[in-house]
């Protein structure tokens, strides 16, 4: 999982990327290709 300042570039890396909020943190998840996971912070 990458940790980045801004998720704007992370959510456009793959068509299946979704931006999700969990426990106050913002994540990008991808069920088709899990190597595109990222977290903001």
UniProtKB/Swiss-Prot annotation:
Keywords: Ribonucleoprotein, Ribosomal protein. One of its GO terms (cellular component) is ribosome. It comes from the Bacteria. InterPro entries: Ribosomal_bL36 (IPR000473), Ribosomal_bL36_sp (IPR035977), Ribosomal_L36_bact (IPR047621). This is Large ribosomal subunit protein bL36. It comes from Rhodospirillum centenum (strain ATCC 51521 / SW). The lineage of its organism: Bacteria, Pseudomonadati, Pseudomonadota, Alphaproteobacteria, Rhodospirillales. One of its GO terms (molecular function) is structural constituent of ribosome. Belongs to the bacterial ribosomal protein bL36 family. One of its GO terms (biological process) is translation. HAMAP family: Ribosomal_bL36.
């Amino acid at each position: 999982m990458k940790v980045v300042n801004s998720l704007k570039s992370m959510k456009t890396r793959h068509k299946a990327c979704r931006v999700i909020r969990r426990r106050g943190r913002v994540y990008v998840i991808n069920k088709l290709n899990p190597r595109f996971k990222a977290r903001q912070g």
